[in-house]
């Protein structure tokens, strides 16, 4: 089973609109073209689909993702409008990935850059894990770990301790995927005597400078995506970068 993660395309209604380092629509086009060549079995897009929160930006994203040769799923980030997303493509909270499954969490706090699950969503997560012991990936927008950039760590998942506590009773959780940070991250979290892999993904748009105290764009880094191979032995992963001719 080959899963690809795309994150943070930050599209505008105007496909020619520029970001700090390029044209987000063209960047996402290039990323999707590269992902098609990966022949994935599924794709997950971990939030911040839109920069301007326009209906047109979600329609443009959905048209691009519909060119993928496989099912695709998305979840909201802090910049997103759930209703506009759902109007273009269903929002789901769980999908089967062969012998694995993936849970998609909504960490959005309306009007705020940070994320939070809260008691209700954490209880729902525990209930989903109680009902199914298949190897499980969890995808969410906000990092549930510190990524090492002070300004980004201040706007991550606020209730990350409660999140990891909720996972502690469920050894079927093998890995967690996040967006938001616009940079590669790979680490582990000790969770009830085992280690859970945690992965961040390069954005499909601008990249952020790793380990920065304050907001800074990494103008030298290209957009990218993450590939995960899921099998009976576990999950292996790699990151690919995409050169965009603009």
Mark where each language-model region is.
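N-terminal active-site segment of His-dependent metallophosphoesterases
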Residues: 1-60, 130-131, 147
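Active-site neighborhood of phospho(di)ester-bond hydrolases with catalytic His/Asp-centered motifs
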Residues: 5-7, 42-48, 72-78, 106, ...
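Acidic/histidine-rich helix-loop elements
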Residues: 4-26, 81-89, 111-119, 209-218
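Conserved beta-sheet core of the metallophosphoesterase superfamily
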Residues: 153-226
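A short C-terminal boundary segment appended to hydrolase-like catalytic domains
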Residues: 226-246
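Binuclear metal-dependent hydrolase catalytic cores centered on His/Asp/Glu-rich metal-binding motifs
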Residues: 97-137, 150-166, 218
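Active-site environment of divalent metal-dependent phosphoester hydrolases
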Residues: 12-15, 51-56, 79-84, 110-113, ...
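Active-site-proximal beta-strand elements of phosphoester/diester hydrolases
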Residues: 2-13, 99-109, 137-141, 196-203, ...
């Amino acid at each position: 089973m080959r899963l690809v993660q795309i994150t943070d395309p930050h599209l505008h209604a105007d496909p020619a609109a520029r970001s700090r380092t390029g044209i987000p629509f063209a960047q996402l086009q290039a990323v999707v073209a590269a992902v098609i060549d990966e022949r994935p079995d599924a794709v997950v897009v971990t939030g911040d689909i839109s920069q301007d929160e326009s209906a047109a930006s979600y329609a443009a994203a959905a048209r691009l993702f519909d060119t993928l040769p496989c099912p695709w799923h998305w979840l909201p980030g802090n910049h997103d409008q759930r209703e506009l997303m759902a109007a273009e493509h269903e929002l789901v909270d769980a999908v089967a990935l062969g012998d694995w499954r993936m849970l998609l969490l909504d960490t959005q706090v309306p009007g705020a850059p940070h994320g939070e699950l809260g008691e209700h969503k954490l209880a729902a997560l525990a209930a989903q894990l109680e009902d199914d012991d298949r190897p499980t990936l969890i995808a969410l927008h906000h990092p549930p770990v510190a990524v090492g950039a002070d300004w980004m760590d201040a706007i991550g998942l606020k209730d990350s301790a409660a999140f990891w506590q909720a996972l502690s009773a469920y050894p079927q959780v093998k890995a967690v995927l996040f967006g938001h940070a616009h940079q590669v991250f790979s680490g582990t979290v000790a969770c009830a005597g085992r280690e859970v892999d945690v992965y961040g993904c390069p954005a499909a748009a601008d990249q952020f400078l790793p380990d920065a105290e304050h907001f800074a764009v990494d103008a030298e880094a290209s957009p990218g995506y993450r590939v995960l191979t899921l099998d009976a032995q576990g999950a292996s992963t790699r990151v690919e970068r995409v050169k965009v001719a603009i």
